[in-house]
Amino acid sequence: MENITAQLKRGISRQFSTGSIRRTLSRQFTRQSSLDPRRTNMRFSFGRQSSLDPIRRSPDSSKSDDEPHMSVPENLDSTMQLLFMASKGDVRGIEELLDEGIDVNSIDLDGRTALHIAACEGHLGVVKALLSRRANIDARDRWGSTAAADAKYYGNLDVYNLLKARGAKVPKTRKTPMTVSNPREVPEYELNPLEVQVRKSDGISKGAYQVAKWNGTRVSVKILDKDSYSDPERINAFRHELTLLEKVRHPNVIQFVGAVTQNIPMMIVVEYNPKGDLSVYLQKKGRLSPSKALRFALDIARGMNYLHECKPDPIIHCDLKPKNILLDRGGQLKISGFGMIRLSKISQDKAKVANHKAHIDLSNYYIAPEVYKDEIFDLRVDAHSFGVILYEITEGVPVFHPRPPEEVARMMCLEGKRPVFKTKSRSYPPDIKELIEKCWHPEAGIRPTFSEIIIRLDKIVANCSKQGWWKDTFKFPWK
């Protein structure tokens, strides 16, 4: 008896890889099961598993006809008792439970109903009894499998034919370009696509993230459009972005939630930041106070320094701009959009844009001259972008405003021009201007690394606090 209970509970150990997310006090994401009034907090792992379960048993697993009768363990809740009886073919026991008021469509942690279990095991009598009690014939488990699909997979043709005659649907299994050959190789980040709800009215924005819900939690989702499945370049770009997002963890970098790679549509899911991006924020606020400007600058620098220090290969953003910098609920900045531009590695610290014409927008005046001109570059291209952003934060207007972006990009990248500083020098520490000029210098070798930028920004903060400048406005919330 204890062995049966242990098998039933063993599946709970896999719970960590699925479910909704919650933020802990340490600002890290952990996984928890979605809440469903009919869902038990256990996973039914006794007997045959879903036909789409990555670690299911083999369809030709033999069931011993000499297996002794087993009674229901006393410490199981009503849902698990129902599923257990379905697995053992106990029609009378099931009817007694249903007469007591148990929901015939009760599900376990994997979304499996008694009908799923009975179909897997081939218990025709149980299936008939459940259908007579109006069991949902097309209920799908967390992998998208139905009772009919399970019956077909395990070769229970009598059950399958009955379900088909009652109008059951068998979901089509469509392979994705990232489908693994061995079910045990399914990534831990894999999400159940049925738990991700994207509003149809929003449509699908090609290549862009959109707001969705995952188990009731707001998230941002990028959905791979249908035309991309036959395009190796787009699949590789999707895979590259996913690989980078999966390995980064930093307070100033967008948080990866999970992805759907074994089902269509394929999608990447990241945290949702309700306050939008820095571009919209600057349009509303204009020039920021010195304290907020420095705090934002440090947020960006710390996130970028983390990306540049990633091992074994640093992550060059190559598209750092306000639209790719998000604000979380607390007003902290997070870097996003990295991995969108594919790079060809020239050496350990040198790279080149893989397909310049396809990936580089020549109206993007945040990019460094060497990127604009399709030259070989290193990590310092991101320092140039940081300098332009820091200028806009302190000045409150885009560079060379109101000239069109295409003209501004040519002026900065081809003509080597830089905008003048219009804000009064006493409004900001003089070291800020010097740092901006170093960052956007035409010569990449003169630009500082982000570790050096952080040191300089910390010194500016310390000097301002020490000298008591801007007492009314220069207050640091982190001190």
From Swiss-Prot:
Q: Which residues form the active site?
A: 319
The superkingdom listed in its UniProt entry is Eukaryota
Mind telling me which Pfam families this protein's record contains? Ank_2, PK_Tyr_Ser-Thr
On this chain, the residues bearing Phosphoserine are 17, 26
Which residue windows are coiled coil?
Answer: none
Give the protein name, as stated in the record. Answer: Integrin-linked protein kinase 1
First and last residue of the signal peptide: none
Q: How does it assemble?
A: Interacts with CML9 and POT5/HAK5.
The places in or outside the cell where this protein is found are: Cell membrane; Endoplasmic reticulum membrane
The species is: Arabidopsis thaliana (Mouse-ear cress)
Major place of localization? Answer: membrane
Q: What does this protein do?
A: Functions as a link between plant defense pathways, stress responses and potassium homeostasis. Promotes osmotic stress sensitivity, responses to the bacterial-derived pathogen-associated molecular pattern (PAMP) flg22, and resistance to bacterial pathogens. Promotes the accumulation of POT5/HAK5, a potassium transporter that mediates high-affinity uptake during potassium deficiency.
The reported result of mutating residue 319 to N is: Increases kinase activity
